[in-house]
Design a protein with these regions (language model features):
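Peripheral, non-AAA+ core regions of ATP-driven protein-machinery
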Residues: 1-218, 222-228, 266, 331, ...
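P-loop NTPase nucleotide-binding/switch module
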Residues: 170-209, 213, 240-295
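The Walker A (P-loop) glycine that initiates the GxxxxGKT/S ATP-binding motif of P-loop NTPases
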Residues: 221, 285, 307
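Walker B catalytic acidic pair
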Residues: 300, 306-307, 318
Length: 510
């Protein structure tokens, strides 16, 4: 008897429906075709043990399983449940009449229990798009799938529940959540606040400008000056995630298996801080079966690279293209996948190998060591970082000050006003904030008077800045003007923007 069951495969951050055809006929053997990986090929052992432990067994006949489309690689153990149900239906142990209404996914344990799977949100979205009535999943994944409206989501703990459901002997409980309520309740929850930062007013201002325009920023300062403390508080001043951004972000983390059990929707911007020993594949994504890297996990949020020169230069260089294009393409011989990577880069570094230049009384870093240290960061990479700011060590008087600094909410309100101005400006364009401006937008929205032009010309000549750095100055100046609610860029805005570029040559060529 031939039976069709439906599952789903992940491709990038999207899903594709898989038709699992199971035929049980006279003969012996277990044949699995349709480009499955080793984990799927091993499923026969898990399925056999699981069925035996819930009172069923594999039929003593020839079992042929085809996973279509045959040219799409299928991977992982998430097809265990759908294959097992198909085998039982083809053996007349399950009524097959309603199988075509559901996507069925789940990894089987040997006792018949179900383990959580990855990529549930894109699977649920695809199921709704293709008109399926519902989706049957491990119970740990149901909160995530229930984000999708107009789709019945059933969570099960073992395969026996699924067998009884299709035989009409049990009703499964639907999982329902109020997505909007869930989103609004957690949208302003942050573990860190800028009011906890003592001193560092200049650095705080630079962080505000960076957040307002979506600019990348690098903090240069000695150990203990508060670089990491400042970076961890950036998400608290960024605009709240929109529902569209929350769904995008959740899909990426779902595909990567980074969603916790019983987690539904990511409601705050991600903050990713990989160690400096990370490989280029782990950073940008890839592998034999491509997975999102850290830059995609930071999509719509912050990627913090602490001690930037300690990262391998090759690792940093592969980040150049995603920084510019805000997406990363991973190509293989037979396919390619795109992962979004629109993130705000926050990097930090010491000014020298010793960490204390130019205030090191013993001058423990030689000129050669300094040059080698700075050469780890290429000019093209630095040009893609809009704001370079020096973070000074905090004096005792500032640390002892009991009065709290400005809160994240106050800073965020100014950032939101600037973002609203940008949203109106770019409402007819495919960009959202100033950092995304291209040459045409810069020419149109960053018009300078003669005083501003002379000011920036002098800075370019004195600091030997590149054409890309010139564009960065204009973008940052536009953001500063937006924070001031000014229609035109003034010399004061240009001066402040230049101040955020001056470190790149003073320090890099120390």
């Amino acid at each position: 008897m031939l039976v069709k069951v439906f599952g789903s495969a992940i491709h990038g951050v999207s899903a594709q429906t898989i038709t699992i055809e199971v035929n049980v006929d006279q003969g012996v053997g277990y044949h699995l075709v349709g480009l499955p990986d080793n984990a799927i090929k091993e499923s026969s052992h898990r399925i056999s043990a699981a069925l035996k432990n819930v009172g069923h067994k594999l039929p003593g006949k020839k079992i042929t399983i085809n996973m279509a489309p045959a040219d799409l690689r299928k991977e992982g153990s998430a097809y265990d449940l759908s294959i097992a149900i198909g085998i039982l239906a083809a053996s007349d142990k399950i009524l097959a009449e309603n199988l075509d209404q559901y996507i069925i996914m789940g990894e089987l344990s040997l006792d018949g229990g179900l383990q959580p799977i990855k990529g549930v949100l894109p699977i649920a979205i695809k199921a709704r798009e293709e008109g399926f009535k519902g989706i049957i999943l491990p119970k740990q994944n149901t909160q995530e799938a229930a984000i999708v409206n107009n789709l019945d989501v059933y969570g099960v703990e073992n395969i026996k529940e699924v067998i009884d459901f299709f035989n009409g002997e049990r009703d499964l409980e639907k999982t329902e959540i109020d997505t909007r309520k869930e989103f609004q309740n957690k949208i302003n929850e942050f573990p860190y606040d800028f009011s906890e930062v003592k001193g560092q007013e200049t650095a705080k201002r630079a962080m505000e400008v960076a957040a307002a325009g979506g600019h990348n920023i690098i903090l240069v300062g000695p150990p203990g000056s508060g670089k990491t403390m400042l970076a961890k508080r950036v998400p608290s001043i960024l605009p709240p995630l929109t529902m569209k951004e929350a769904l995008e972000t959740t899909k990426i983390h779902s595909v990567a298996g980074k969603m916790g059990s019983n987690t539904s929707l990511m409601t705050v911007r991600p903050f990713r801080s990989p160690h400096h020993t990370i490989s280029d594949v782990a950073l940008v994504g890839g592998g034999a079966y491509p997975q999102p890297g850290e830059i995609s996990l930071a999509h719509n949020g912050v990627l913090f690279l602490d001690e930037l020169p300690e990262f391998k230069r090759a690792v940093l260089e592969v980040m150049r293209q995603p920084l510019e294009d805000r997406e990363v393409t991973i190509s293989r011989a037979k396919f390619s996948v795109n992962y979004p990577s629109s993130f705000m880069l926050v990097a930090s570094m010491n000014p020298s190998p010793s960490g204390y230049f130019p205030d090191d009384p013993n001058n423990t870093s030689s000129q050669t060591e300094m040059q080698r240290y700075m050469n780890k960061l290429s000019g093209p990479l630095l040009d893609r970082i809009d704001i370079h700011i020096e973070v000074q060590k905090v004096e005792f008087e500032q640390l002892a000050e009991k009065r709290k600094g400005e809160s994240s909410i106050e800073i965020r309100n100014r950032v939101l006003k600037a973002r609203e101005i940008q949203a109106k400006r770019y409402k007819d364009l495919d960009i959202n904030y100033n950092a995304q401006m291209g040459p045409k937008e810069i020419e149109k929205y960053c018009d300078l008077d003669s005083t501003c032009q002379q000011l920036i010309k002098n800075a370019m000549e004195k600091l030997n800045l590149s054409a890309r750095a010139y564009d960065r100055i204009l973008k940052v100046a536009r953001t500063i003007a937006d924070l001031d609610d000014a229609e035109n860029i003034s010399p004061a805005h240009i001066s402040e923007a230049i101040q955020y570029r001056s470190l790149d040559r003073d320090f890099w060529r120390a």
